[in-house]
Amino acid sequence: MTVEQKFGLFSAEIKEADPLAASEASQPKPCPPEVTPHYIWIDFLVQRFEIAKYCSSDQVEIFSSLLQRSMSLNIGGAKGSMNRHVAAIGPRFKLLTLGLSLLHADVVPNATIRNVLREKIYSTAFDYFSCPPKFPTQGEKRLREDISIMIKFWTAMFSDKKYLTASQLVPPADIGDLREQLVEENTGSLSGPAKDFYQREFDFFNKITNVSAVIKPYPKGDQRKKACLSALSEVTVQPGCSLPSNPEAIVLDVDYKSGTPM
């Protein structure tokens, strides 16, 4: 309801006067939104979720729906889904931390819902930083609490990368044929120096990567090292070529005693 009615955390931003433009006749004052009710409400939601995630899938679904409706995919713009005033930073990031807790608890079975919620969380976080910085209007105690909330969100966000599983990056089965078609179309349009460079670069790259296949049968240690140096000795450096690991640097030579590119 507060989202639709634009109350508290979701209220429209009031344009504040520039303190540098103040005069004796006009003394500008900050216009922070009233977010104390949302502070209390989100505190309750955080505590309730810690119980619900163990015993009530219905309540978890309500939490998921509430978070989805409270956040937006938009970043920046004249009107944000939440008030960007510095006084609203505490409840905003406490709500976002609750969203990450919901994802980390692995209680939402639908992968699409999880992915959309994660994207909304990040978008809403970035949206706060799309406006110019402002001087805090909170009291000392509340400001310390808000900073602590942001640190907790950062910690939760930093650990969120382990929930981006490899299965999300697996390409579809039919992409192989399309890839070959695109490669043929792109390389077929090359001619002259461009085609010569393409052939030199990928010939050199294929020979370097093939070294791994050559040394794979050898056990780790001196035998594998000798096999590696032996395979590298057969590779001739081509002029103007680079390695994918460092495309901005041109390989001038290879130290065949250590295998280090130079």
From Swiss-Prot:
InterPro entries: PI4K_N. Residues 180-262 are annotated as: Pleckstrin homology (PH) domain conferring phosphoinositide binding specificity. It comes from the Eukaryota. Belongs to the PI3/PI4-kinase family. Type III PI4K subfamily. This is Putative inactive phosphatidylinositol 4-kinase alpha-like protein P1. It comes from Homo sapiens.
